[in-house]
UniProtKB/Swiss-Prot annotation:
The gene is folD. Catalyzes the oxidation of 5,10-methylenetetrahydrofolate to 5,10-methenyltetrahydrofolate and then the hydrolysis of 5,10-methenyltetrahydrofolate to 10-formyltetrahydrofolate. GO terms for biological process: L-histidine biosynthetic process; methionine biosynthetic process; purine nucleotide biosynthetic process; tetrahydrofolate interconversion. Belongs to the tetrahydrofolate dehydrogenase/cyclohydrolase family. InterPro entries: Aminoacid_DH-like_N_sf, NAD(P)-bd_dom_sf, THF_DH/CycHdrlase, THF_DH/CycHdrlase_cat_dom, THF_DH/CycHdrlase_NAD-bd_dom. The lineage of its organism: Bacteria, Pseudomonadati, Spirochaetota, Spirochaetia, Spirochaetales. This is Bifunctional protein FolD. It comes from Borreliella burgdorferi (strain ATCC 35210 / DSM 4680 / CIP 102532 / B31) (Borrelia burgdorferi). The keyword Chaperone does not apply.
Amino acid sequence: MGFKGYILSIVFNGKDFANKYYLMLKEFLKQHNLRDKIALKVVLANDEPASNLYVSIKSRVAKEIGLNVEVIKFSANSVQSDILEVIDRENKNLSTDGIIVQLPLLKGMDLNSILNSIVYSKDVDGLSFVNLGKMILGDKKGFIPCTALAVLKILRDEGIKTLGKTVVVVGRSPLVGRPISILLSSKPYDATVIVCHSKSIYLDVYLRQADIVISAVGKPRLIDKSMLCGKPYVIDIGISEIETDNGKILSGDTDFDNIKECVKFITPVKGGIGPVTVLMLMFNTIKAHLINNRMFDVLNRLEKLLEV
């Protein structure tokens, strides 16, 4: 769905968006005799219900399109060396194409040490220092973090122009906000990017300048309609639980019901950015297999298919 002219309040359907591409990937793997030949290993080192749900979704999607997936789960009394040992084993395993670590980790574990223990050619979440460096330098053999890649995919497919536009990114984490701001300020996106964070005093002033708002801070209902001007496009990556009279509900960084009529485009909390992030994980995993097996002609076809 592109924007040809002026369209009011498009609520993005990430589930339908991703499902369309899942069918394409499934057929692509079949055509190139790659079904059941690509393996993703998922390291799960926490017992949070949300993490278990996310892992089950990733596993289900991977299996549906034709990837092999194994979840390696660690108990609550596991130590960091246990995880590093498994990652080292899978780094050396020639049949493993991609390795991801489902966050958060158990308390006391060092995030950077674990993420950087994954060899960059299998780091399909794109969170190691090597891949973040490749992203900054524009090395296409590296892996862009999946959420950032999902944002780029949504902008491209929905016809949301970034050239010369003002993009306000709320959040500067190295996992989400920072990669997005770097990518959008680079070629070919060429946006003017303003990065806001917890210490930004005049958030509303910056937001009113935005053609595009991308928020990833995990603060429920941080952004309301009083902070926006000129009907921007809004991509809400944040997700939090809030208490209501009817129990806990999920909330994004935006007050969705409050602002949805004041924007041109918005992603909801449920069925918004999430399914597209999983789609990009599938893309990165297939890409890893193709690069590691020097199947560059097939990789070119994959990139054209998904337009990434």
